UniProtKB/Swiss-Prot annotation:
It comes from Parasynechococcus marenigrum (strain WH8102). Pathway: Porphyrin-containing compound metabolism; chlorophyll biosynthesis (light-independent). Signal peptide: none annotated. PANTHER family: MAGNESIUM-PROTOPORPHYRIN IX MONOMETHYL ESTER [OXIDATIVE] CYCLASE, CHLOROPLASTIC (PTHR31053:SF2). This is Magnesium-protoporphyrin IX monomethyl ester [oxidative] cyclase. GO terms for biological process: light-independent chlorophyll biosynthetic process; photosynthesis. The keyword Ion transport does not apply. Its cofactor is Fe cation.
Amino acid sequence: MVPPTAVAEANAVATKDPVKDTILTPRFYTTDFDDMAAMDLRPNEAELEAICEEFRKDYNRHHFVRNDDFDGAADKLDPETRRVFVEFLEQSCTSEFSGFLLYKELSRRIKQQNPLLAECFAHMARDEARHAGFLNKAMSDFGMQLDLGFLTANKDYTFFQPKFIFYATYLSEKIGYWRYIAIYRHLEKNPESKIFPIFNFFENWCQDENRHGDFFDALMKSQPDTVRGPIAKLWCRFFLLAVFATMYVRDVARKEFYEALGLDARTYDKMVIEKTNETTARVFPVVLDVNNPKFWTRLERLVENNAALEAADRSSSPAPLKLFKKLPRWISNGAEMAKLFLMSPIDSAKFQPAVR
């Protein structure tokens, strides 16, 4: 289990202040626990029970064990690579820890009324805690750790209805699978770009993400209203777009991390988005037309706007002038997101022969 606070080893490890919340940083979520507890799983109970049995096996119980490869690995990185890698560790640890908190609270709050659902969430909380702890331990190699207890108490929590939790976490888990497996496969072919031994663990790690995504797939199928009808189609499109756009803008903004791994951030993200979009067709009624060139052109405009907004924040201009500079960028972002949302989606049935 993740410790509630970061523990300094012989006073050598400092507690790192969490990054300032922005639209691109990981969110912490809460939901309507009574609604979750009252869910009738019978429409897809057999599949959920089968997935829970997979969780019980805990395939990665002995996987996240550090070895001698970590000794001195941090000292081999140049200052810029250290900076972008620590940023990656921090963002990843925060994301995994937010999942742990949500899943743990769900398992605790619905245990009496919905034991099968509660057990599934407890197993996923176990996995997320393991991931977050492993990432935070890697941060200690660089002389710092996150105070996870402070994050628990002081982070703002976003309330989502259960169905929105399903959409967001399903996409987060599936996109996490494709991100991790893509990096792992690239580094297997290009070992000279493996800047830190944590990447050796990504192959098994990504299978946890995949199983979690499969759980939410089965859970949505047990609640047919989440994936059927015109309103469900609109929400599926919205969450696909929000997740893809956020990832693309964030990753291009920190492209130096991917360059350190020998990857191009745009090429990497395009592959991850295409694969996730294809995978999502297994459960969502519609997916995005990511093969339309306009999709990528509009994402690039979001990247440009985000860069301009960050530049305005860094400037020493007076607050009114900063606002004047940022306002047209905000308006442009809204317009581009609207154009992206209004692009014709693809019926998931057209993807089925290709979905594996």
